[in-house]
Regions:
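Acidic/glycine-enriched connector segments
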Residues: 8-119
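Extreme N-terminal starter segment of soluble prokaryotic enzymes
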Residues: 1-4
């Protein structure tokens, strides 16, 4: 059993983007795997929740604790990066912000680019 992190830019929130994410998810998912994500209502986080519901897969959501201030999202990203065994990232063209932060933290931990899937 592995944990698949699914994250992504809020700007990539179309049905087409969901289908792209779903195809990659099906490629790496094995029976018993779980999903981890960040609870944003748009983009990759929303796709994670849709996939979990659609397939009856357990999901762990790391919501940001905004009482910690403006860095709460980046702190939350650390938890996702630490928990995931593989990471699907629905990236925006500019490749900045929280999604890129999660990718960087994940790759620093696993040191294996084949576990990071950019879609």
């Amino acid at each position: 059993m592995k944990k698949i992190g699914i994250v992504g830019s809020r700007s990539r929130d179309s049905e087409k983007d969901f289908k792209i994410c779903e195809v990659k998810f099906r490629e790496i998912y094995e029976e018993g795997d779980e999903i981890v994500s960040g609870g944003c209502p748009r983009g990759g986080d929303r796709f994670a929740e849709r996939l979990a519901k659609k397939r009856g897969i357990p999901i762990k959501i790391y919501f940001p604790d905004w009482s910690l201030g403006k860095n709460a999202g980046f702190i939350r990203n650390t938890f996702i990066a630490q928990d995931a065994d593989e990471l699907i990232s629905v990236v925006a063209e500019d490749r900045t912000g929280g999604t890129e932060d999660t990718i960087s933290k994940f790759l620093s931990r696993v040191n294996d680019e084949s576990k990071s899937h950019l879609v």
